[in-house]
Structure formats: structure tokens, C-alpha cells
Amino acid sequence: MRILFAAAECAPMIKVGGMGDVVGSLPPALKKLGHDVRLIIPGYGKLWTLMDIAPEPIFRSNTMGVDFSVFETKHPSNGLPIYLVGHPCFDSERIYGGEDEDWRFTFFASAVSEFAWNSWKPQVLHCHDWHTGMIPVWMHQDPEISTVFTIHNLKYQGPWRWKLDQITWCPWYMHGDHTMASAMLYADRVNAVSPTYSREIRTSEYGEKLEGLLNYISGKLRGILNGVDLDEWNPATDNSLPAKFSVDNISGRAINKRVLQERMGLEVNPDKYLMGMVGRLVDQKGIDLLLQVANRLLSYTDSQVVVLGTGDRYLESSLWQLAIEYPGRFSVFLTYDDALSRLIYGGADAFLMPSRFEPCGISQLLAMRYGAIPIVRKVGGLVDTVEPYNPMNETGSGFCFDRYEPIDFYTSLVRSWEEYRHQKSWKQLQLRAMSNKYSWDRSAKEYELMYKDVCGIKEPSPDAAEVEKFSYGQEADPSRKGKKIKL
């Protein structure tokens, strides 16, 4: 199949959130399945110095009364074709924000539609979040191009209909209060980035006032879990780590922990329980919960905490105040540093994700891959990826709590701190977490099935061996083979 990905981000060149990881990693996994996959993104200013781009455009056109050009280049990691929409509105290095954000991304969606109609015509046009939300609306009139719309974060919904009428052409048949709603209505298939999140957004608690619409379109809505690039994120080959390690020998983590403590200005002590946090410092990520329990946690335990990220100024200053109050035990780096994030994954004992909501989450997957035990709230993709630890039967890969309440989070933190003192069981917990492999290959097969479904391509009947596999590739119990179930 010919598949075109349209998005505002693509890792590693342009990455702000999880969407960049998906757009950067899912296409090569689909290519391995034999599909012709290409990407189209805005031609941001920084890309012209980062990438080798052909000087002459491959396509020129006009939309929304503005001329634009499309240039071709290659993805630096996997070599897939990437098309860049060139226009002065994308010349700055800014990705999001600004008074012209609604116009810029509506223009981008319109340019992508013109390109798909008149240049490289895909069978499936895969759109990501509100930035490309008008594409399914316009493609609704073209029976030769099917559209898939992926919801990465329902909270960001794009410009409202009254503003869209002012900046672009809205078809007579268009319904929906804003870009996100219209995209979900007119896309041939809609998916969220985890099965649990696809169910949660159909409720008033997580639906962002779109739960009625999402229940209305539930027949074409599904949840497909994100994955991790197991080659890029591999502690056995990661050159960012002072000491490499693997599930067969995790002794290198002790060296990484010492280096992390030194770099973050913490007391260098291998026996201290070190917790890490990497990500955007916003309410969604549960930073307010951490602020509410930090004083009690640091008073009751001998734990250490490191936080890496940027975001809300109030939350940044509050975290900085804790670092001043607890020198050597609480450290904050208000920036994003890829090498330091890998050191936190590979050196911290535990990883904090007390999210208010979490569509999927990549950080908990990376943490488990690197042996940092996740402490998460049971919400969204965290439910699908982190199995609660049960010391009685020695199962699970992390510590989980239900309610978005400080006492629940604090209880999980103390419970993990106490478990850390039992190093034998803690090491087994680490090994189980590191053995989880949420690769993009599994996710790509689920997306492939959705693409074939929307294009009307019938799948051959699976053989008996395939029927006996669980959805995540685990083999069925051999002792049950050949046994019949009595009805």
C-alpha cells in the first residue's frame, strides 16, 4: 500500500511530544512489512541546516490564496522519503505557539491535500492530531484516498469553526465545532494511542467535552498501543551511558547511578533510593502531586529525586525551591538534554509518572527498558504497559496507584522505597521490567490491519498457530494445544 503520514512533528529532527516519536518510528516498521511509506511535514527553518534537501521543489501550487512549494529529502535514520512544505510562515524555528498558529497549520493541511491530489497520491493518508484535522474533511470527497486520524492528545483541539470559516474553505457538508471534531467525523478510521485511552475518552472525565461524539463514532474508533524503537533505545549499545548493560548483566547500572548523582549534585551513595522524572513540567504530568508529597517523602525516607524538563513557570519555580531546600537530595535541571535523560533512565532506581491523564506515554516504556522501575497512576496507556507489582507471587513490572490524590501517590512511593531495601526481589523486578518489549513491529501490524480494513483489502484466514497466540505475541500454553472446549 501507498501510505502518506502527515504530521507537525517527526523525530529526531522535530520533536516536542510523543507524536514526534510515533511519526519517526512507525513508518519504518510499516516499510518492513512491504509498504511504500512517506512523510510530509512543515519545512521548519531549522530543517534546512539539519538535512540534505534538494534545492529545487518537486511540486508547486497555490492554496488559501498563497503560493507554496514542496521539497523532497530523506529521513536521516531510516532513509524514508520526507516532503517538506515550504513557505515563509514556517521559516522560524518555532513549532507551536504564536498568534498565527491556527492559520499556519490549517494552511499546512490544505497544502498536504493539494499535494496528495496532484502529486504523490496515497491509498491511505494518515493524519496526526488537530494540526492535520482538516485533511479528512477535504479528502471526504475523494473516494480513492482513505484517511486515518490518530488522537495523540484530545485536550488540544484546534481552531473553532467560526475561525476556520475566516481563514480557509470549509465544505458545505462539514460538521463539527472545531478541527478535532471535524477530523473525527470525516476520517474513515480513528484511533487513540492506547486501548485504555480509547475507552477513557468516551467518558465525561477524559472526553474533553467530546465524549458524545466519540461514542457516536465508536464503531470506527480503536486503540493501538505505541511502541519503542528497540535499536535506538538499547542500554547494551547506548553510547550516552557511562556503562552499558543488558538484562543478562545489569551491573553497569551502579556506575551510571554514581555518575548521575555526581552530575546532578546529589550525595554520592549507592544505597540511596534514587527516583527520576523526565518530561514536560505541566499539570498533566502530575507535577503538582510531586510538590505536595515531596516534603513528607524526603523527611520520612532517605530518598533522592532528580527532575529533568521544562514547562509551566510556576511549577518550575516550585521545583527549584525544593532543590534549594534539600541540597544533595533533590535536583532539578530546567532544560531538555537527551544524553541526561538516558542517564536518568539507566541510572535511577525508579521513574515517576503520576499523570493526571496519559494517552499512551513513552517514558515508562523507556524506563523499563533501562531498568528503572516505573511508579505510575492507573490511567491511559500506563494501564496497558505497567503491570502492578505483586510481591506475593513475584509478578508485575512497576508500582501503580488509582486516585489522583497525594496520599495515593505517597503510599506508592513509600511502598517502592521499602521494597528497594530488599535487593534480591528488587533485582528480579528490574529484570521483569527490562524483559518487556513493546516494539513498533507489533504496533505496525495492528496499523496494517486497520489500513487494509479501510481500503477493503481482505486478510487471509490465520493458521492454527497464529490463532493460539495472544494479541501481544505471547505463545499460548503448549499443554492446551489440541484440547477442545466444551460448550
UniProtKB/Swiss-Prot annotation:
GO terms for molecular function: alpha-1,4-glucan glucosyltransferase (ADP-glucose donor) activity; alpha-1,4-glucan glucosyltransferase (UDP-glucose donor) activity. Keywords: Glycogen biosynthesis, Glycosyltransferase, Transferase. GO terms for biological process: glycogen biosynthetic process. ADP-alpha-D-glucose binds at residue 15. It comes from the Bacteria. InterPro entries: Glyco_trans_1, GS/SS, Starch_synth_cat_dom. It holds the Pfam family Glycos_transf_1. It catalyses: [(1->4)-alpha-D-glucosyl](n) + ADP-alpha-D-glucose = [(1->4)-alpha-D-glucosyl](n+1) + ADP + H(+). Residues 468-487 are annotated as: Disordered. Its EC number is 2.4.1.21. It is an enzyme of class 2 (transferase). Pathway: Glycan biosynthesis; glycogen biosynthesis. Synthesizes alpha-1,4-glucan chains using ADP-glucose. Belongs to the glycosyltransferase 1 family. Bacterial/plant glycogen synthase subfamily. PANTHER family: ALPHA AMYLASE DOMAIN-CONTAINING PROTEIN, GRANULE-BOUND STARCH SYNTHASE 1, CHLOROPLASTIC/AMYLOPLASTIC. NCBIfam families: glgA, PRK00654.1-3. This is Glycogen synthase. The gene is glgA.
